[in-house]
């Protein structure tokens, strides 16, 4: 996902014009600096909300639906470098959230609160998903309701399995 984001940024910058990136494209200051020297401008969500008629790269972490809606309203062209694995996960969560059934369920995401990917996942549920960072937090879930558990793509499988076992 990260390699794709960098390649897309390089391609766009080679074509000339201004390219913004919503958040640091990677967690590597040297690479961020190199792309900045090529012309990439890193912005935050506040900057993005006030941007109009621009081209913005979305990094591998993914974004909530609200970001795409703002882009549409503000005539922002999106260069989407969201990792395909993250996109599939977002789609699964959104389907589960929007599926109308009689079951009273809660969507739970094992991940780091505030992490860009997790914000994108929670956004699929209009902010209703519950985020847990460790097994202890799973103990606070409402076990009278059905639980649908998902994980941030970069989290430990071992810890995820412990949470699954606890919930069972």
Give the label of every model feature segment.
Residues 2-168:
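The feature marks the mature, well-folded catalytic cores of soluble enzymes
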């Amino acid at each position: 996902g990260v390699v794709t984001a960098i390649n897309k940024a390089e391609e766009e910058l080679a074509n000339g014009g201004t390219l913004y990136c919503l958040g640091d494209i990677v967690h590597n200051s040297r690479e961020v600096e190199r792309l900045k020297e090529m012309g990439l401008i890193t912005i935050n969500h506040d900057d993005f909300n006030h941007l109009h008629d621009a081209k913005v790269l979305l990094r591998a972490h993914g974004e909530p639906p609200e970001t795409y809606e703002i882009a549409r309203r503000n005539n922002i062209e999106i260069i989407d470098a969201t990792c395909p694995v993250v996109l599939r996960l977002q789609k699964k969560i959104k389907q589960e959230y929007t599926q109308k059934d009689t079951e009273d369920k809660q969507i739970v995401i094992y991940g780091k609160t505030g992490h860009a990917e997790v914000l994108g996942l929670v956004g699929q549920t209009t902010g209703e998903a519950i985020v847990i960072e460790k097994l202890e937090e799973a103990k606070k879930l409402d076990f009278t309701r059905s639980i649908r558990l998902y994980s941030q793509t970069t989290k430990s499988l071992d810890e995820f399995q412990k949470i699954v076992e606890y919930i069972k």
